[in-house]
């Protein structure tokens, strides 16, 4: 298995430069639900990328894969759409790979895989003790 170079951006012109430089995957980071609580007080970057950014990046790149990290599994609220809608829109907007972060159960993974429904590659980000135990 070869090393895959990834670059996180929501700027199409930067994505094109990265792609030209040999980056294999352009990464759009939609994850924000609960992130401030999980990373509060830490010196970390919290992206505010959008589903519209997925489309803009998809339109800008030609050879790199488009990796999109969605939010952890969630239902719709007044503030955000459901996981199913977020995942479907990401794929419709050009995601080649959809990443599920911060999952804690097999049921969440099953829901994620069902929502993707083989329309894109999937990637699981193991970052909880519960995920490691699955």
What are these regions (language model features)?
Residues 1-5:
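Extreme N-terminal starter segment of soluble prokaryotic enzymes
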Residues 6-9, 121-134:
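Active-site glycine- and acidic-residue-rich loops that bind
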Residues 13-25, 30-111, 115, 125-127:
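Active-site beta->alpha loop and helix N-cap motifs at the rims of alpha/beta catalytic domains
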Residues 117-119:
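Short gly/pro-enriched beta-turn/loop segments at secondary-structure junctions
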């Amino acid at each position: 298995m070869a090393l895959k170079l990834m670059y996180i951006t929501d700027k199409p012109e930067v994505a094109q430069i990265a792609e030209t430089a040999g980056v294999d995957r352009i990464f759009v980071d939609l994850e924000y639900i609960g992130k401030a609580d999980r990373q509060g007080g830490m010196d970390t970057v919290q992206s505010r990328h959008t589903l519209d950014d997925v489309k803009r990046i998809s339109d800008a790149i030609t050879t790199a894969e488009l990796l999109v990290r969605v939010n952890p599994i969630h239902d719709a609220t007044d503030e955000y759409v459901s996981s199913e809608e977020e995942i479907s829109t990401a794929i419709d907007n050009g995601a080649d790979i959809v990443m599920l972060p911060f999952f804690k159960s097999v049921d969440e993974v099953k829901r994620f895989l069902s929502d993707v429904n083989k329309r894109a590659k999937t990637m699981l980000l193991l970052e909880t003790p519960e995920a490691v135990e699955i």
